[in-house]
Structures are given as C-alpha cells and as structure tokens.
C-alpha cells in the first residue's frame, strides 16, 4: 500500500464540516468520492483537523492509503477534476507509511477575521465576523500575552468533547489590524473543541471593556467557562497551516 499526502484548500460555507456524516455534505465525503472516481477504490482519508460547519481551510492536510498506480504528484489533478469548486487539492505527494495527517502533526495555525464597523459587510461576509461596536485593539493585544504558554484551557472549550487532557501549549497569539479589519492569528500544539473561537470571543470581551485584561489569568486558573467570552461564529475561522 502507498501513502498519499494531500494539502487541501476549501470554503466551508456550504459544508457540514470536515468529518463524514450519515446525512449532510462534508469535505471528507466529497474528497473520498472523488478518489473513488479516480481509482475505483473505496478508501477513508485521515484529516489533520475535524473542522466544524462553516470553517474554512487554506492548508488542511490529509492522507490515505492506496494500491493505485497513479504517481503521487498526479493525484492532485486526478482528484481536482472530480471535486466541486469549493474544494481544491493544492498539492499531492507520496510519503512514508508511518505518516498520519492527524497523529504526526506537531501544531497548527488558525486565523480569525473580524470586521469592526457599524454597517454590516455584504461582500465577503462568509469569511469574517461582523462586530459593530468599537473594539480596543491595544487592550486585546495586551490580553494575548496571558494565553501564550502551556496551560489548562478547559475554560475555553465547549462541552461535548471526550478528550483526556485539556492542557495545551499556545506558541503564538497576535493581532494584525488593517483599518476596520482585525485578524487574529493563533498557533498551538493542539486545540480543544471550539478553543480558538472562545479565545477570540474572550478577546472581544476585553476589547469592548466588559472584561479586564488581568482577569484572563484568573479565568485560566479557575477553568470557569462561564467567565470566558462567547463562542464566536465559525465563518471567520480559517485553518492556515499544519506543522510536522
């Protein structure tokens, strides 16, 4: 069996997330269907992340095992010609048998985009979160420092996960601002369920003055989900890169 690695870009607006479901359109399902059409093999692909409905990716990584004779770098074209317009294989290559898109990963970078103006945005609204009240970006930047490092992030996780540990290491968290566009970048060795979206919601709570920067330390130590911010909508979230 050969092991093929894919780098995938997708617009998650019209998907029910990455993971195959009995009902609903998923990224995993459309790619597996395209591979079946290209090779005649019913395979299961492993994704680096299980993104939720509405979340996008610039560089999702996946891998699958195949007996096909298609050269590794030619799978890109073979699959792309059978995919819908909102999913694209950016690169394909044959890798070692022990590579696994999820379990071999050392970390990921996500971005989240906020448009901070009173008027809602009509163009490109599916890729950002509209927040109409003024945000103090300098205070939000100060708050970023409290998240960096190895902590128990259970206060920033939505219920419904069965993971064994809620401790993660955030390597970097910073904010770029261009006019009324605020873009938050976060890199970590792993993420809890909705962790990025809740951290962004907490930064918004700092930015609108409803939470003090110094309270972040207490929220992390107490692990109290109710004291953290809201879970912002998925559409502003993009998986930017996966590290190996």
Swiss-Prot record:
CDD domains, alphabetized: PseudoU_synth_EcTruA (cd02570)
The answer to whether the entry has keyword Cell membrane is no
So what EC number does this one have?
Answer: 5.4.99.12
Please name the InterPro entries in this protein's record: PsdUridine_synth_cat_dom_sf, PsdUridine_synth_TruA, PsdUridine_synth_TruA_a/b_dom, PsdUridine_synth_TruA_C, TruA/RsuA/RluB/E/F_N
Assembly and oligomerization? Homodimer.
Keywords for the protein's UniProt record, in alphabetical order: Isomerase, tRNA processing
Protein name as it appears in the record = tRNA pseudouridine synthase A
Which SUPFAM superfamilies does the record cross-reference, listed alphabetically?
Pseudouridine synthase (SSF55120)
Q: What class of enzyme is it?
A: isomerase
Question: One GO molecular function term?
Answer: tRNA pseudouridine(38-40) synthase activity
Quick one: which residues bind substrate? 110
Q: What is the lineage of its organism?
A: Bacteria, Bacillati, Bacillota, Clostridia, Eubacteriales
What Pfam families does this protein map onto?
PseudoU_synth_1 (PF01416)
Q: What does this protein do?
A: Formation of pseudouridine at positions 38, 39 and 40 in the anticodon stem and loop of transfer RNAs.
GO BP term (any one): tRNA pseudouridine synthesis
Which residues does UniProt mark as catalytic? 52 (nucleophile)
Which gene produces this protein?
Answer: truA
**Keyword Calcium included in the entry's annotation:** no
Tell me the protein family, please: Belongs to the tRNA pseudouridine synthase TruA family.
Q: Which reaction does it catalyse?
A: uridine(38/39/40) in tRNA = pseudouridine(38/39/40) in tRNA
């Amino acid at each position: 069996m050969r092991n093929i690695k894919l780098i995938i870009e997708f617009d998650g607006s019209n998907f029910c997330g990455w993971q195959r479901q009995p009902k609903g359109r998923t990224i995993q399902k459309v790619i597996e269907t395209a591979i079946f059409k290209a090779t005649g093999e019913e395979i299961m692909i492993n994704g680096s992340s299980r993104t939720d409905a509405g979340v996008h990716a610039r560089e999702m990584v996946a891998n699958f095992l195949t007996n096909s004779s298609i050269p590794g770098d030619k799978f890109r074209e073979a699959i792309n010609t059978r995919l819908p317009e909102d999913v694209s294989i950016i690169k394909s290559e044959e890798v070692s048998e022990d590579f696994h898109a999820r379990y071999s990963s050392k970390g990921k970078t996500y971005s989240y985009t906020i448009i901070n103006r009173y008027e809602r945005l009509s163009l490109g609204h599916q890729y950002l979160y509209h927040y109409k009240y003024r945000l103090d970006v300098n205070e939000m930047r100060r708050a970023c420092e409290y998240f960096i490092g190895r902590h128990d992030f259970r206060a920033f996780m939505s219920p419904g996960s069965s993971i064994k540990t809620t401790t993660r290491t955030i390597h970097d968290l910073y904010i770029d601002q261009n006019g009324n566009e605020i873009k938050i970048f976060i890199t970590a060795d792993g993420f809890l369920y909705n962790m990025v979206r809740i951290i962004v919601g907490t930064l918004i709570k700092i930015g609108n003055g409803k939470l003090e920067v110094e309270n972040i330390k207490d929220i992390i130590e107490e692990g109290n989900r109710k004291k953290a911010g809201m879970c912002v909508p998925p559409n502003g979230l993009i998986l930017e890169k996966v590290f190996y």
